[in-house]
Amino acid sequence: MSAKGQARTGLTELHLAVLLFGGTALFSRLIPLSALDITLLRCVIAAIVLALLVKLSRQRLRLLRGKDYLIALLLGVIVSLHWVTYFAAMQLSSVAIGMIAFFTYPVMTVLIEPWFTGSRLHLRDLVSGLAVLLGVILLIPEPSLGNDVTLGILVGVVSAILFTARNLLHKRYFTAYSGQQAMFYQTAVAVLVLAPWHSLDVGDISNQTWGLLLLLGIVFTAAPHALFTSALRYLSAKTVGLVACLQPFYGAMLAWLLLDESLTLATAIGGTLVVATALFETSQSHKSQAPKKNLG
């Protein structure tokens, strides 16, 4: 396959992966279970599928170093809390609002990463942080946690903080493993973390709900991670980051088409501000990582 053909294939895989990632939000509304129970069953199914993918691709399930199991445990705990808060945010508010609140994470990454790397924080990053804060404020209907939408926004921001922490820790300590290996351990640990807290009665779950759970665990969890990993072979990190910023748009469009969710003007403006800032920071971060041709 030519380089142009590889890039086209990678871009198709990437957009499909981001579309599927955006589609996960719909299941917070479609599956009649709590956020914790949805996450638990999602992780059970995804862990099984990911283990099979690792074996079929002839990779090792065993980790290289003993200390990596402790890192996998920490990452799994963070992922379990991230996914529970991710679904809870949308159950409390709406798919669009929950996803916009969650998508504050690219700017959070820019603001928090210097603490991990010792790099300098730029003025533009602080301005981006203020822009995202303004965007989130526009989403809030009233400054009271008694309002479910306001609470959902707060929970979505907590989910973004957890996701940011997971990404930074993974980047620093767990990059020796493929996406399938890493996600297998994170979903498997999440099952162990969440299992004691579930309120499931398996016998009461309908066949339709089981079908939705299988769809979520296989098509909307394992498959997009595999597609995303494949796309990384053909595309630059900048392209991947910029396309990933379309996730809230895809999620909101799917919610509008399939769930008949509508956007208020304030939500549309706030969401545009958050996503535009995420796009800007993603673009700038990759520019800063590029080799400098002329420093004079």
Regions found by a protein language model. Give the residues of each.
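Glycine-/small-residue-enriched transmembrane alpha-helix faces in small-molecule transporters
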Residues: 1-40, 44-46, 77, 85, ...
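Loop-to-transmembrane-helix transition segments
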Residues: 9-19, 60-85, 127, 150-159, ...
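Membrane-interface helix termini and inter-helical loops of multi-pass transporters
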Residues: 26-34, 91, 137-151, 195-214, ...
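Hydrophobic/aromatic residues within transmembrane alpha-helices
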Residues: 31, 38, 42, 89, ...
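Transmembrane alpha-helices of multi-pass small-molecule transport proteins
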Residues: 33-81, 106-109, 162-169, 183-201, ...
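Specific alpha-helical transmembrane segments that line the substrate/conduction pathway
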Residues: 37, 44-48, 87-118, 159, ...
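Hydrophobic transmembrane alpha-helices of multi-pass small-molecule transport proteins
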Residues: 50, 54, 73, 121-141, ...
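Helix-helix packing/entry segments at the starts of transmembrane helices
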Residues: 98-104, 170-189, 221-257
